[in-house]
């Protein structure tokens, strides 16, 4: 019986989009070796992504920086919308499955996702679902590969090493600081509402004052 799994990647980075992925099909057809994408190498994720796409239905939704920075929304709402968008691409009435909960209240998150999908589906949201269910783990891989490709494209566009895009990554912070010093503004791929972006702008302003 076909079921589904949904997860997202890129909720926390200061650079670039967030991606959600939904995978639907027979759970028994999930490729061997699927595990939470964060524990796999990039090459292994790409290999499994190809195998998942060859054997399952896959939907991917992107949430760009301008939507993330919109003051009229929040990350929980955007995560619900992205998961529902991806899920709506692969499901039909009567299907059931699991999504990785992006809210402290799992039941509320699951209801919100289900309510945004046109098909009549049964959604169960759980924290850490990518560790428990192969279909969610497969969706985690697809979402992370989409995010990886996005970061690679950004690095190529800026002709620079931008790191992973996460605030904890020193390469990302160095790229952001250097860009702001040179251009006097954030790169378009930066989430301006993130504290890391504000810090980069503040440091550049302070440096300019010190030089004056």
UniProtKB/Swiss-Prot annotation:
It comes from the Archaea. Manganese or magnesium. Binds 1 divalent metal ion per monomer in the absence of substrate. May bind a second metal ion after substrate binding. PROSITE patterns: RNASE_H_2. It is found in: Cytoplasm. One of its GO terms (molecular function) is manganese ion binding. Its EC number is 3.1.26.4. Keywords: Cytoplasm, Endonuclease, Hydrolase, Manganese, Metal-binding, Nuclease. Its main location: cytoplasm. Residues 1-206 form the RNase H type-2 domain. GO terms for cellular component: cytoplasm; ribonuclease H2 complex. InterPro entries: RNase_H2_suA, RNase_HII/HIII, RNase_HII/HIII_dom, RNase_HII_arc, RNase_HII_hlx-loop-hlx_cap_dom, RNaseH-like_sf, RNaseH_sf. A divalent metal cation binds at residues 7-8, 100. GO terms for biological process: DNA replication, removal of RNA primer; mismatch repair. It catalyses: Endonucleolytic cleavage to 5'-phosphomonoester. It holds the Pfam family RNase_HII. Coiled coil: none annotated. Belongs to the RNase HII family. NCBIfam families: ribonuclease HII. HAMAP family: RNase_HII_A (MF_00052_A). Endonuclease that specifically degrades the RNA of RNA-DNA hybrids. This is Ribonuclease HII. The gene is rnhB.
């Amino acid at each position: 019986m076909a079921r589904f799994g949904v997860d997202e990647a890129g909720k926390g980075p200061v650079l670039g989009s967030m991606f959600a992925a939904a995978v639907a099909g027979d759970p028994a057809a999930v490729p061997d070796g699927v595990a939470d994408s964060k524990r796999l190498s990039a090459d292994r994720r790409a290999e499994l992504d190809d195998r998942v796409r060859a054997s399952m239905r896959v939907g991917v939704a992107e949430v760009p920086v301008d939507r993330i920075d919109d003051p009229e929304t929040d990350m929980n709402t955007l995560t619900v919308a992205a998961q529902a968008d991806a899920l709506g691409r692969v499901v039909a009435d009567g299907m059931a499955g699991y999504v990785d909960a992006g809210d402290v209240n799992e039941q509320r998150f699951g209801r919100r996702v289900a309510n945004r999908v046109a098909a009549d589906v049964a959604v169960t949201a759980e924290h850490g679902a990518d560790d428990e269910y192969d279909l969610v783990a497969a969706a985690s891989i697809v979402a992370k590969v989409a995010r990886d490709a996005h970061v690679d494209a950004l690095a190529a566009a800026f002709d620079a090493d931008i790191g992973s895009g996460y605030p904890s990554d020193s390469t990302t912070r160095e790229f952001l600081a250097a860009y702001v010093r040179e251009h006097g503004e954030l790169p378009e791929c930066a989430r301006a509402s993130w504290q890391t972006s504000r810090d980069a702008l503040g440091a550049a302003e302070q440096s300019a004052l010190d030089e004056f």
